[in-house]
A protein has these predicted regions:
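Glycosyltransferase catalytic domains, chiefly GT-A lineage
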Residues: 1-185
Length: 185
């Protein structure tokens, strides 16, 4: 029986190995019998021991796990990388270019996400020509204290969670959206 193959991208460095491991395990442990995840980890210097620990965690599952070094990807761009936004986090911008062999929907997950069930239904979401599917944050409601923290006007309703992104990489490529994001940044 042919399994449904889905690409999932996460991003981490050595400091994030524990939450990365939890997210990977929760993803694989909830996968249905017909689901095969291709997991790509955008890495900024994950050392051999830490990478091997994630590989051992994934080994009992029917999946593919690949680390992609993105440590040099921002050298030509003037992106600010901070503790909150390290190099691997910026890597999500480059997913359509980094994973040229992938087509259709790819799921990006932050490493603080706990997966509670098989994601086949999510991957089969009809994106209807849209480049990205997002979940709007409830905190962006007018009057929320997060509006002040985010320095957004009280009428702002457009803040979304960038830690869960369903990306249609075909649309990104057709519309050259990576270049558009780079030009905007």
């Amino acid at each position: 029986m042919k399994k449904n193959e889905f690409a999932v991208v996460l991003a981490s460095d050595n400091r994030g190995i524990l939450p990365l491991s939890v997210t990977v395990f929760s993803l694989l442990n909830t996968a249905g019998p017909e689901t095969f995840y291709k997991i790509y980890v955008l890495s900024d210097g994950i050392d051999g021991e830490n990478g091997a620990s994630v590989e051992r965690l994934a080994a009992p599952f029917d999946c593919r796990l690949e680390f992609i070094d993105v440590s040099g990807i921002l050298e030509e761009h003037d992106f600010p990388h901070t503790e909150q936004w390290p190099v691997p986090a910026w890597g999500r911008v480059f997913i359509p270019e980094l994973l040229k062999e992938e087509r259709g929907n790819i799921l990006y997950l932050d490493i603080d996400v706990l997966v509670c069930r098989d994601l086949t239904e999510l991957f089969r979401t009809n994106m209807d020509g849209k480049a990205v599917g997002v979940v709007f944050e409830n905190f962006s409601r007018p009057g929320s204290h997060f509006n002040e923290r985010l320095e957004m006007p009280l009428t702002c309703t457009g803040y979304f969670n960038s830690g869960v992104l369903l990306m249609n990489v075909d649309v990104f490529r057709e519309r050259n959206l990576v270049r558009a994001v780079l030009d905007y940044a």
